[in-house]
């Protein structure tokens, strides 16, 4: 181990899959921090700005290694920001934007069948994660005034589910 060369340690050697996962994680973290800067303004955004700055060198390296994933991530996060600005009532549009990011993680699979299957699996996982996160954040977003498509789709300005909205959301999340 480089950190403790005198002490023998077990470690995992790098491989292509781990490098891919690490690069994609850095790209996602960087853009999430940049989004935090945009969402929180100058003063509250300082911690996000500092963290993004600290990650910048690693981000540039990861983006150079995975330019297509970086491009898809930037494009879909910009799409999400536009939907948030417009206070879009659609559940499918923002869920699709997030799902497209996760689906892009499969683009480097060598086998075409594996790429298609992984892409579909990650797409649906991403859609589900987005919807569940929106449901989990509903009350907090209603209180803080943050965008949440559930508020605009079902008129849940108080952050409380109605029986009808819960049933409609469950049907959407299940498909």
Located regions from the model:
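Alpha-helical bundle/repeat cores within regulatory domains of eukaryotic proteins
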Residues: 171-175
